[in-house]
């Protein structure tokens, strides 16, 4: 990092701008360190670890914007903050909420300063090509104290007498781009952790796997709509919603004594239960002959006698 002396010359303000831009690098490396060391330090299930790695491959428009993401994350974290929870996902999501808020403001400030410098850059100055600007992957390998020096050497190699205001503009644009890529990585991690609090880590893991499968399937072989986490986490409720429920309660089998089957027989064309006591036959039944009196048991005298 260069120690520039502030001079009253016409480009003194520009030198002050370069010095200020080097101070902003202290906030640049925070998400880089967090996102690099994050995967190796955090213990998690192997399936969850794979799903988290797949989060980085999801389309950019899948995730909410920074403002919406931070607001949704705060709503999900508020109950845990009130109870002073120390769950893994709560601690990490809280860290990324604070990090993204501060880091996003720093990045927006870099863009605003860079745009304001356009008015004082000579109109004939050619912009620094992208190949001369440090990229995000290179910034991860360069020490913090050497980042500004490496970028300045590249600008000088492009044009030794490059205007000072244009150099400041190139520095800010390079750092802002690195910031945005780091913010995107932190944004995906924040989305993962606060959704694990809302839906459960296993459900989010399952959702990411199904979504990745849907995205990798050719359009003509997959469904029209992408899978949603609501449908995955509530399959039972959805299936039972269309079933008609009976008004009464059904007793489970086996809790009431078995009813004994009653055997029946047919007597004179009528059904009678054997379990009932047999009653004496009535004097006269339908379809039966008249009962004989006791005297009828003796034979009547023969008329021949």
Swiss-Prot record:
Q: Identify the species of origin.
A: Duck hepatitis B virus (strain China) (DHBV)
Propeptide ranges are 273-305
As for subcellular location, the record says: Secreted
The alphabetized UniProt keywords are: Host-virus interaction, Secreted, Signal, Viral immunoevasion
Report which superkingdom the organism of origin falls in.
Answer: Viruses
Q: Where this protein primarily resides, as one coarse class?
A: secreted
Question: What is the protein's name according to its record?
Answer: External core antigen
In the UniProt record, the signal sequence range is 1-19
- InterPro entries for this protein: Hepatitis_core, Viral_capsid_core_dom_sf_HBV
**Disordered, as annotated region:** 226-305
One MF annotation (Gene Ontology) recorded for this entry:
structural molecule activity
Q: Enumerate the SUPFAM superfamilies for this protein.
A: Hepatitis B viral capsid (hbcag)
Q: List the disulfide bonds.
A: none
Q: Where is this site: Cleavage?
A: 272-273
The record, for Pfam families, names: Hepatitis_core (PF00906)
A single Gene Ontology CC term: extracellular region
Belongs to which family?
Belongs to the avihepadnavirus precore antigen family.
């Amino acid at each position: 990092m260069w120690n520039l002396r502030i001079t009253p010359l016409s480009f003194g303000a520009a030198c002050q701008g370069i010095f200020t831009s080097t101070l902003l690098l202290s906030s640049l490396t925070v998400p880089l360190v967090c996102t690099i060391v994050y995967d190796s330090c955090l213990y998690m299930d192997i399936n969850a670890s794979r799903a988290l790695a797949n989060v980085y491959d999801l389309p950019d428009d899948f995730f909410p914007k920074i403002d919406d993401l931070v607001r949704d994350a705060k709503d999900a974290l508020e109950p845990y903050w009130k109870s002073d929870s120390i769950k893994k996902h709560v601690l990490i999501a809280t860290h990324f909420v604070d990090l993204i808020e501060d880091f996003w403001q720093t990045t927006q400030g870099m863009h605003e300063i860079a745009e304001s410098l356009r008015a004082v850059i000579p109109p004939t100055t050619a912009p620094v090509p992208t190949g001369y600007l440090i990229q995000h992957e290179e910034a991860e390998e360069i020490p913090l104290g050497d980042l500004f020096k490496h970028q300045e050497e590249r600008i000088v190699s492009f044009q030794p007498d490059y205007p000072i205001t244009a150099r400041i503009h190139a520095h800010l644009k390079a750092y802002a781009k690195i910031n945005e890529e780091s913010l995107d990585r932190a944004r995906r991690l924040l989305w993962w952790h606060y959704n694990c609090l809302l839906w459960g880590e296993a459900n989010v893991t399952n959702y990411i796997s199904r979504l990745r499968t849907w995205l990798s399937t050719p359009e003509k072989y997959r469904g029209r709509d992408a899978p949603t986490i609501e449908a995955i986490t509530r399959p039972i409720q959805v299936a039972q919603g269309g079933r008609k429920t009976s008004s009464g309660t059904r007793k489970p089998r086996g809790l009431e004594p078995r009813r004994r089957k009653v055997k029946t027989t047919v007597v004179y064309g009528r059904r009678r239960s054997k379990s009932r006591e047999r009653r004496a036959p009535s004097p006269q039944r339908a379809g039966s002959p008249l009962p004989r009196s006791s005297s009828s048991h003796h034979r009547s005298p023969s008329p021949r006698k």
